[in-house]
Amino acid sequence: LELCAAPEKDESGDYRLGAWVRDSMAGIGTMTFYDPESGIFGALGHGVTDADTGKLLPLDHGSIMDASVKAVKRGERAAPGELKGDFDLTRDSGTLFANTESGIFGKLSAEDAEKLRTQALPIAGKSERKTGKAQILATVEGKETRAYDIEIEKIYSSSGSTRNFLLHVTDEALLAQTGGIVPAMSGSV
């Protein structure tokens, strides 16, 4: 990356040059789907955006790694809460190749793909979606993925929006622990 910039004088008469650079992003998120045939996965269900500008962050390359949820900040009205955790920095579980409005996408390592192969579940096609009782799979403590009860209240038509449906958490254990869906759970299926 090459840039040209001209320094400016500050109040004391000294020339200064300011630069705002972001070279990485990190966070805990949820894998939404995995294709056992190709090893391709999608996660989050929404793009990763710059906290200051709200714009989608460009992604040249990246890695995913295992994470463990260490704490939950319970969500309340007007305060979304969050999952807090640690990354396993000793090995990559796969590579990232895209950050889009619909989520991040990548390919799992052969070792991690094999671990998930026996846990793969079929997903409903667009025509199979319906309102009513359902379950999401989420990890809100340690590395244990559990099923939680929800109610799908409304399905939105595909108007180009990344918003697909409105759900209501009905699972008492999840409500007690997190208060509902908190950031880092948005890719839960």
Where are these regions (language model features)?
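Catalytic nucleophile loop of clan PA
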Residues: 178-189
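Serine endopeptidase catalytic core focused on the charge-relay Asp
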Residues: 1-177
